[in-house]
């Protein structure tokens, strides 16, 4: 999926509002995913998955940092996310559907925290962005 110039502008503007909260939003999205889609917990058997756990917060920061990296490289997502794609495909072997589930939870989290900025156009752009990130992360599964 190709991001238009308007999509890129919307994604950058929305992510600038996230600011230093990317890790917190990432952790909240993970908690939403674990609650809404309990089968996703199987990838984290060694984690304390309780609300506010240090392990979920740490992984949320990794998610937030990866998305911040992606926002900074909208014109070369495959290059920017290559190592992360390798990790998830070859070492962690995460089922690709889980990226879609996390994307859904990220959109929900952003909508809750950025209600005035989460317009239909921004929602659509963020959805396209997260879909593109998911596609890149699963590209090495083949």
From Swiss-Prot:
<keyword id="KW-0408">Iron</keyword>
<feature type="modified residue" description="Phosphothreonine">
    <location>
        <position position="9"/>
    </location>
</feature>
<feature type="modified residue" description="N6-succinyllysine">
    <location>
        <position position="8"/>
    </location>
</feature>
<feature type="binding site">
    <location>
        <position position="59"/>
    </location>
    <ligand>
        <name>O2</name>
    </ligand>
</feature>
<feature type="modified residue" description="Phosphoserine">
    <location>
        <position position="4"/>
    </location>
</feature>
<comment type="similarity">
    <text>Belongs to the globin family.</text>
</comment>
<feature type="modified residue" description="N6-succinyllysine">
    <location>
        <position position="12"/>
    </location>
</feature>
<keyword id="KW-0479">Metal-binding</keyword>
<feature type="modified residue" description="Phosphoserine">
    <location>
        <position position="103"/>
    </location>
</feature>
<dbReference type="GO" id="GO:0005833">
    <property type="term" value="C:hemoglobin complex"/>
</dbReference>
<keyword id="KW-0007">Acetylation</keyword>
<feature type="modified residue" description="Phosphoserine">
    <location>
        <position position="50"/>
    </location>
</feature>
<dbReference type="InterPro" id="IPR050056">
    <property type="entry name" value="Hemoglobin_oxygen_transport"/>
</dbReference>
<keyword id="KW-0349">Heme</keyword>
<feature type="modified residue" description="Phosphothreonine">
    <location>
        <position position="138"/>
    </location>
</feature>
<feature type="modified residue" description="N6-succinyllysine; alternate">
    <location>
        <position position="17"/>
    </location>
</feature>
<keyword id="KW-0597">Phosphoprotein</keyword>
<dbReference type="Pfam" id="PF00042">
    <property type="entry name" value="Globin"/>
</dbReference>
<dbReference type="GO" id="GO:0042744">
    <property type="term" value="P:hydrogen peroxide catabolic process"/>
</dbReference>
<keyword id="KW-0813">Transport</keyword>
<dbReference type="GO" id="GO:0031838">
    <property type="term" value="C:haptoglobin-hemoglobin complex"/>
</dbReference>
<dbReference type="GO" id="GO:0019825">
    <property type="term" value="F:oxygen binding"/>
</dbReference>
<feature type="domain" description="Globin">
    <location>
        <begin position="2"/>
        <end position="142"/>
    </location>
</feature>
<feature type="modified residue" description="Phosphoserine">
    <location>
        <position position="139"/>
    </location>
</feature>
<dbReference type="InterPro" id="IPR002338">
    <property type="entry name" value="Hemoglobin_a-typ"/>
</dbReference>
<dbReference type="GO" id="GO:0072562">
    <property type="term" value="C:blood microparticle"/>
</dbReference>
<dbReference type="GO" id="GO:0005506">
    <property type="term" value="F:iron ion binding"/>
</dbReference>
<protein>
    <recommendedName>
        <fullName>Hemoglobin subunit alpha</fullName>
    </recommendedName>
</protein>
<dbReference type="InterPro" id="IPR002339">
    <property type="entry name" value="Hemoglobin_pi"/>
</dbReference>
<dbReference type="GO" id="GO:0005344">
    <property type="term" value="F:oxygen carrier activity"/>
</dbReference>
<dbReference type="GO" id="GO:0031720">
    <property type="term" value="F:haptoglobin binding"/>
</dbReference>
<feature type="modified residue" description="Phosphothreonine">
    <location>
        <position position="109"/>
    </location>
</feature>
<dbReference type="GO" id="GO:0020037">
    <property type="term" value="F:heme binding"/>
</dbReference>
<keyword id="KW-0561">Oxygen transport</keyword>
<feature type="modified residue" description="N6-acetyllysine; alternate">
    <location>
        <position position="17"/>
    </location>
</feature>
<dbReference type="InterPro" id="IPR009050">
    <property type="entry name" value="Globin-like_sf"/>
</dbReference>
<dbReference type="InterPro" id="IPR000971">
    <property type="entry name" value="Globin"/>
</dbReference>
<dbReference type="GO" id="GO:0004601">
    <property type="term" value="F:peroxidase activity"/>
</dbReference>
<comment type="subunit">
    <text>Heterotetramer of two alpha chains and two beta chains.</text>
</comment>
<feature type="modified residue" description="Phosphoserine">
    <location>
        <position position="125"/>
    </location>
</feature>
<comment type="function">
    <text>Involved in oxygen transport from the lung to the various peripheral tissues.</text>
</comment>
<feature type="modified residue" description="Phosphothreonine">
    <location>
        <position position="135"/>
    </location>
</feature>
